[in-house]
A protein has these predicted regions:
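Conserved catalytic cores of very large enzyme subunits
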Residues: 1-306, 327-328, 332-492, 497-499, ...
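Contiguous, well-ordered alpha-helical segments that form the cores/surfaces of helical PPI scaffolds
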Residues: 67, 310-323, 344
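Short, intrinsically disordered terminal segments enriched in charged and Pro/Gly residues
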Residues: 502-509, 513-515
Length: 516
């Protein structure tokens, strides 16, 4: 297993979608000119990210940046029509800040996600458009923050919808910079929840249902998560039972997962209770601005954190099934059904734990990040397999990155998996190059994904940037200035990153990828 953010064990929670409107400090900006109010609000937002980012261990999100900040500025009597240049400059500065500020834990940038797309009025539409446009126009090495576009029928999904133009603008930006990614509000698992309540982190964390009545992500957290190494369980099962047929090996592997999951549950509960026992003074920003769905000043931490999720994650479903059955789930119906069976089995367990402990246990399709290579390095010291040669395990339930199956088929194969992973998941389409100028083509894939059951969708492609002249494309030597000083931007686990800073497992995965 891998205990994520171990250095924060029992000290703080993982991630949070801000309840930004509940206690917004309007009085701090009362009486200011429009220009000062605009600059002041965006400076406040940066300060908020910086402060909260050091009170917790993971990402931060705004569920409805466009609507919420249109409401904030309207309350402050700020008119966007006469201040467009100031808004553009302030949003541009915010984007640059997200890339250049490295004060999280004293050394790294912040994991920030803006969810947009549901804009209800012209002001909100302007903010959504400007965020996308300024990100699009920013330098090729600007790859933060993560922007998530919420796709919903009657709002932006179809040509007759009021915000369809914003969807096309978002897809145009994705074709150049891989951002935004897309939260598909009409998919099977999300269609019964109001789109305004839905929000995701760039790392794929999903917080929706709540045993205590606070449906949706706003003001709620993932408290902690632990990932189980599925290939390791398969290797151990085959070693323990070398003569069993594959169907029986599969059942034995599930039994082994169950025993590990019981231990994981104990650790999650221990961490949750220790976090709830912390002094609320360790969370001064949450106290001051009441960003959680409950008021910790009144109820204490446990009554607020109980609305959060405790997630059991998994990695390497594909490799696990390969070890057991000797094949790939995307081209074998029997193995594909076993994949569905395994996901249903794991989800059934987390649902039972939620009932047993009256807490929001969930199943998380883990992003690889630190563990895709780490697990391989550990396992290959104990077992022998050709699977280790590639140097990493495949993220969550994904089709392996060198499968070369068509994009529509990858989407449809993975789509059925999403509904089981109520703690978060994402499907990616791997493209050979940036689909610049083809938003309609990406829109068709978005539509296929919605109908296939995909909850969260991203588009990946290799993006190389010349560090000398800024030319972008796919190359080892710049075609403009002949420089070999190339910066490679890739997405492997959720957020875009520079490939030079990848862990070994992520570097191996990036090199192995083939286009769908």
């Amino acid at each position: 297993i891998h205990i994520h953010d171990l250095d924060a064990y029992g000290l703080t929670y993982n991630c949070l979608t801000f309840d930004i409107l509940k206690a917004f400090p309007y009085s701090d900006f009362a009486g200011l000119s429009s220009v000062k109010a605009i600059l002041g609000v965006f400076d406040f937002l940066k300060e908020l990210f910086e402060r909260v980012g050091n009170e917790q261990s993971g990402g931060m999100a705004l569920a409805n940046f466009d609507n919420d900040f249109a409401s904030i500025f309207t309350t402050l009597n700020v008119d966007y029509k006469n201040n467009k240049e100031i808004f553009c400059a302030a949003i541009r500065d915010l984007i640059i800040w997200c890339n250049n500020t490295h004060t999280r834990m004293g050394q790294t940038s912040y994991y920030i996600s803006f969810n947009i797309g549901l804009a209800e009025n012209d002001f909100a539409r302007f903010l959504a458009f400007t965020l996308i446009d300024e990100f699009y126009k920013a330098g090729e090495l600007i790859y933060k923050p993560n922007i998530i576009f919420k796709v919903a029928k009657g709002i932006n999904r179809n040509p007759q919808d009021r915000n369809y133009d914003l969807l096309l603008k978002a897809l145009e930006c994705t074709g150049k910079k891989m951002i935004p990614t897309y939260l598909l509000c009409d998919c099977e698992m999300d269609k019964d929840t109001s789109p305004e309540l839905l929000s995701v982190m760039g790392c794929r964390t999903r917080v929706v249902t709540d045993r205590f009545g606070k449906s949706g992500a706003i003001g709620r957290s993932n408290i902690d998560n632990i990932t189980i190494n599925l290939p390791r369980l398969a290797f151990e099962t085959v070693k323990d039972h070398p003569d069993l047929p594959s169907d029986e090996l599969f059942e034995k592997c599930k039994e082994k997962w169950l025993s590990i999951a019981d231990t994981v549950t104990e650790i999650l509960l221990d961490r949750f209770h220790k976090t709830c026992m912390q002094d609320i003074d360790l969370f001064p920003t949450l106290k001051q601005y009441d960003l959680l769905c409950g008021n910790i000043n009144i109820t204490g931490l446990s009554e607020v954190f109980k609305h959060g999720t405790l997630s059991i994650g998994f990695i390497g479903l594909s490799e696990m099934l390969d070890v057991i059955f000797g094949g790939k789930f995307w081209d074998n119906e029997k193995i594909y059904n076993a994949a569905l069976n395994m996901l249903s089995f794991m989800r059934g367990y987390t649902d039972k734990q939620a009932e047993k402990y009256n807490l929001n246990f969930s199943l998380l399709a883990t992003s690889g990040e630190l563990i895709s290579g780490r697990f391989v390095e550990i396992d290959q010291t104990k077992f022998k397999s050709d699977i280790f040669k590639k140097g990493f395990y495949t993220n969550s339930f994904h089709v392996e990155v060198d499968s070369k199956i068509p994009a529509w088929e990858k989407i449809e194969k993975e789509g059925k998996f999403h509904a089981y992973c109520n703690g978060g998941c994402i499907s990616y389409v791997e493209l050979a190059e940036a689909p610049i100028g083809n938003p309609q083509g990406l829109d068709e894939l978005v539509e296929i994904a919605i109908n296939a059951g995909v909850h969260y969708l991203g588009f990946n492609y290799p993006k190389d940037v010349c560090a000398e002249c800024g030319t972008s494309g796919t190359f080892d030597v710049c075609p403009v200035c002949n420089s070999s000083h190339i910066t490679r931007i890739r997405r492997v686990s959720g957020y875009l990153e520079i490939q030079d800073y990848f862990t070994s497992g992520k570097k191996h995965e990036a090199k192995t990828r083939k286009a769908n």
